[in-house]
């Protein structure tokens, strides 16, 4: 009997296990699926950045969705998947119902297979489950494998982020926009409202949230928050690009002591439980700005906190970028804790009266110097760290890279209005001298030399380097206003902030101190003191160039949106101020060959030029096409400037884009240009301009194709033609009239 009981017990175990499995299968809830819209977004952003997808959408044409659905957030993502065969419109129609419906196993398998045949097997799709919803949990596991195939650069990545605000709790917040500890992000298709004041682990790419991986809870620390106002019940703070009121967990009576300070806020379920104010402040001239530190006069290099803030507190409080900290500025205060800068506070606008110039080496070939030698007829104040020394007149300061002299920035300030002469430099004028002060810093690449100088003094050494002093005064005054405006705008770009400079002294910005100052050019600067060009109240980017071909062009030559600089227009240099347009290549070729086309700068040698070249010369600059068989301009920009050049060869063809690249491809140091006046000019490795036409003239005895290139003008062709301005001044036009001719809709005002 016992034996049979044991047998029944053993046989019963499998039955019990099978019964439990059946119960689990019957009663376990189905895993939630992922919508096709959400899946499409994740796939599209694995393949393209949001910017690339936006560009693709503009060229794509008509959407596959109905007109009343085109505005839905998911349309571009799904359109991209349909267009690239990740989804089949015959099986998955392009409509709202299917977009918001769940992705199926079959569809997930198709997407995986399109990326890699090996990925399809991970989906586990079969005939029985093919039309069932593919679980969201499984999709995100699969997504990790998809990223290894589609996003090998790791553009889609995981971040920890705190959500400060969404359209639900912030009035005026744009749809699908979240203010976060990572800045302003978009979250198309996600639901984030319930995550305000939560810390999340998320997947994102270039500012677009893709998926919330984990909610880390509501016990968070908001670091480096600016306190605007408050009362016993809560604080009004500036956090994540927004102003927001946050309540206290318990009433706090000393709120007035917190206002106008930076603090860390300890949060619990959306309420403040602790305020840690950071009161230590330092200030000093900004000498350089690095990725992880700021160099301050009197303090040296101070590291940045990992969650540092840059805040403009005058007017409306606004968060800025590290690049907005202007080197040379003395209007910044820095809030420090534990030896690190937690915030840079800008309490007033930066003055425009000084500029910091990186002095290039000989020949303007490098920003670094191996050796620098400086003398001065007067005494010099030498500053390094917290040490100050007065040097006698005629002292020689000699520094060699790597000698340890300038591992900390060396500042030299001439006394009694003297200038510092850099004996180790050679310019067109000889050995240059500099007003203001000079700074030397040794870097791993060599010595860096920076000149800080008054803006007007800087301009007096720019104008003679950019325009001959023999030119008409009104042309020189127009140049002075242009140069001042250009210098102001470029100085705000902080291009060399890591070295402590804003611009350099080469043609990349404006040539500075290459030619001796002149009384006439200095007078042009003085008579236009402080005057700049404005459009809608903002200083313009006052581009200028040497000589036109009879017409200018606009900023489209640099792939910029012309609408962003409406004052830069394509126009002819004639009294009518009309726009020249060319219906065909033949029309432009006819124009550029005309030496007698009337224009204000038609008398200058580079108004027209031409030269002979060959397939061999062009092939030396254009690789991968074999023996050259043909060259032609296939696209022109406003005014006829060449934008695309098709080069055909025995082994293929290539298209060169951009006027500068075309000038380089067709140029060569061996070329001899015949100019407007019949004289010749050699050494043009970069052609004078992109206003050109090219004609095939036959082949030589070796079968090499020969060409003649006809061109006109010198420079990029955007903004003011300097020789055009001279022609206008000779015709009796004043400097304001000249400037308003070249820059449409501008006003000329004195900078406050």
Predicted regions and their residues:
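Conserved, structurally critical residues in compact or repeat modules of secreted/surface
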Residues: 39-43, 81, 103-104, 108-112, ...
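Short linear loop/turn motifs
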Residues: 92-104, 743-744
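Active-site-adjacent "gating/activation" loops or surface patches in catalytic cores
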Residues: 71
